[in-house]
Amino acid sequence: TSDHGDYQGDHWLGEKELFHEQSVRVPMIIYDPSEYANKTRGTKEQRFIEAIDLLPTFLDAVESPVSKHRLEGNSLIPLLKGENTKDWKEFVFSEIDYAFNEARKILNIGASDARAFMIRNNDWKYIYYKGFEPQLFDLKKDPDEFNDLGKSEEHSKIREEMKELLLKRIIDRKNRVAATDEFVTKERDYTKDDGIMIGVW
């Protein structure tokens, strides 16, 4: 696999960047010699996978504990085993910091504001560049992403739904990496821990 695709002239662009399928949809080939993978060997998996799923997969493959309070992704081992994973992710997320790009200078955008986000499910792709109107693409009717529905009144509801989904994904990021939820919520006497009152308001 790779961390990005390549336009190769599609959309009159080269290289990577932006959020068209040519850039963000990247094939991944997994060869797992384990016997448990025989069930899915030679098959294609169409469910959403993100680069952040790789590290949890590697840790799971060598039976090392996965620090779920630190890692955003999901292990792919259940998919390789052919397990029924009904609660698998229903969307993928991507973001870009284009502070070093020429586009930032042309648009006269501050370095901290040169950020963009994308969220995609099976039907829709929603893109938001900070400081600009959102973009929306109907991936069923417009798989090549030529018709931006970002200002379409008819699609205002789906735009709002995708915006909420994007916001939820950003809000749900794992920011507290030093302690698990179990550790934080464990009942204890704050007045006795090392004689220091921590977390008491």
Tell what function each PLM region has.
Residues 15, 37-48, 61-67, 115, ...:
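Active-site rim elements
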Residues 25, 50-61, 75, 79, ...:
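Generic recognition of well-ordered alpha-helical segments
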Residues 142:
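Intrinsically disordered, low-complexity polar regions and short flexible loop motifs
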Residues 6-10, 52-55, 60-135, 139, ...:
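C-terminal cap/loop subdomain of S1 sulfatases and analogous C-terminal strand-loop tails that border
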Residues 149-201:
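Long, internal low-complexity/basic segments
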Residues 1-40, 50:
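Histidine-centered active-site microenvironments of extracellular/periplasmic hydrolases
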Residues 7, 18-19, 28, 44, ...:
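Conserved beta-strand positions that form and line the central face of beta-propeller blades
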Residues 23, 45-52, 70, 113, ...:
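Short, solvent-exposed loop/helix junctions and linker helices
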